[in-house]
């Protein structure tokens, strides 16, 4: 990469320069090779980025093996020694994730209606009650 010459840029405001007296009051010089603080994004920035990322994607968000164990555990209550095709578990997972995404969309609308941005258990209960899933 070729090096380029730096040109001076006009300042666009920001903090006012500190007085020279304040720098002389310091007893020790700052460390030359100090530890650099890790970069942190402002609150909400990463959340918005994740929302956009997951809205674009179509892959399943629940891990396959834990979901498979859960399905088998629930099926044990109805009949022992049940066997599942892999396509059956994939279909169950697809349906379960679609249901959860829809429920969270409705839950978010309930929270927004209550003039909040944070979803709460009462929002999920209201969304399910409006849907007619729970009386």
From Swiss-Prot:
Region (Disordered), start-end ranges: 1-40
One example GO MF annotation: protein heterodimerization activity
Xref: SUPFAM superfamilies: Histone-fold
Gene3D superfamilies with a match to the protein in the record: Histone, subunit A (1.10.20.10)
CC terms in the record's Gene Ontology section: nucleosome; nucleus
Biased composition (Low complexity): 19-31
Compartments where found: Nucleus; Chromosome
Alphabetized CDD domains for the sequence: HFD_H3
InterPro entries per record: Histone-fold, Histone_H2A/H2B/H3, Histone_H3/CENP-A
One Pfam family of this chain: Histone
Main localization (coarse): nucleus
Domain of life of the source: Eukaryota
Keywords carried by this UniProt record: Chromosome, DNA-binding, Nucleosome core, Nucleus
Summary of subunit composition and partner proteins: The nucleosome is a histone octamer containing two molecules each of H2A, H2B, H3 and H4 assembled in one H3-H4 heterotetramer and two H2A-H2B heterodimers. The octamer wraps approximately 147 bp of DNA.
Functional summary from the UniProt entry: Core component of nucleosome. Nucleosomes wrap and compact DNA into chromatin, limiting DNA accessibility to the cellular machineries which require DNA as a template. Histones thereby play a central role in transcription regulation, DNA repair, DNA replication and chromosomal stability. DNA accessibility is regulated via a complex set of post-translational modifications of histones, also called histone code, and nucleosome remodeling.
Stated family: Belongs to the histone H3 family.
Protein name, per record: Histone H3
Originating species: Mastigamoeba balamuthi
């Amino acid at each position: 990469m070729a090096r380029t010459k730096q040109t001076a840029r006009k300042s666009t405001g920001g903090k006012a320069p500190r007085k020279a007296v304040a720098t002389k009051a310091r007893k020790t010089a700052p460390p030359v090779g100090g530890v650099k603080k890790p970069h942190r994004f402002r609150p909400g920035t990463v959340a918005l980025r994740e929302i956009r990322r997951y809205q674009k994607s179509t892959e399943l968000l629940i891990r396959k093996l834990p979901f498979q164990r859960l399905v088998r555990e629930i099926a044990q209550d109805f009949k022992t020694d049940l066997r599942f095709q892999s396509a059956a578990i994939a279909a169950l997972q697809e349906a379960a994730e679609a249901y959860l995404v829809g429920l969270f969309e409705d839950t978010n609308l309930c929270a927004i209606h209550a003039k909040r941005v944070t979803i709460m258990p009462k929002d999920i209960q209201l969304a399910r009650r409006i849907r007619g899933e729970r009386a």
